[in-house]
Amino acid sequence: MDHYKSNISEVKKETVQVNGSKGAYIQWLITRENGAHYAVRKFTVEPSGIIPMHTHKYQETVVITKGKCKLCVANRVYEMKDNDYVFIDGDIKHAILNHDERLEFFCIIDYAGNMEIQATGEEC
C-alpha cells in the first residue's frame, strides 16, 4: 500500500489494556496493516484517569494535544501540557496520570519483536 487516508472519528476506540488502567482509551490509526514500520495511536484519558506504571520493549514518542497530566518516566516526574512531547526508550518504566480535564495525546511506536506490555505495580 503506497498510502492510507482516514479520519480519527472512523477508528474504533478501545479500552487501554494495561492492568490497572482507568478511563483510558486507544485508537490505532496507522499500523503494520497499513504497510507502516511503526504505529500511530491516539489516546483519550478521562478526568482522573490513569495508565499505570508499565514497561515494554518498543520505543515511543508521546505528544500531548489536549489537557494536562503527570507523566512518570523512570524516576522522573513531569507535568505535561498541550504541545509537550517526550521520547521514551524501550524497557523504561512509565505512567500517565490525568488531572481534572479530558486528556488527548498521540503516541508513535516502533514494532519491537516482543510487543507485550508489563504492568510493574509501582506507584508514579
Task: Describe each model-derived feature in a short phrase.
Residues I26, V40-H56:
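Conserved short histidine dyad/triad with adjacent acidic residue
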Residues N75-G90:
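Short acidic-glycine-tyrosine-enriched beta hairpin
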Residues I92-A95:
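Short, charged beta-turn/beta-strand-edge "cap" motif at the junction between a beta-strand
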Residues L97-H99:
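Asparagine-centered strand-capping/turn motif at beta-strand->loop junctions
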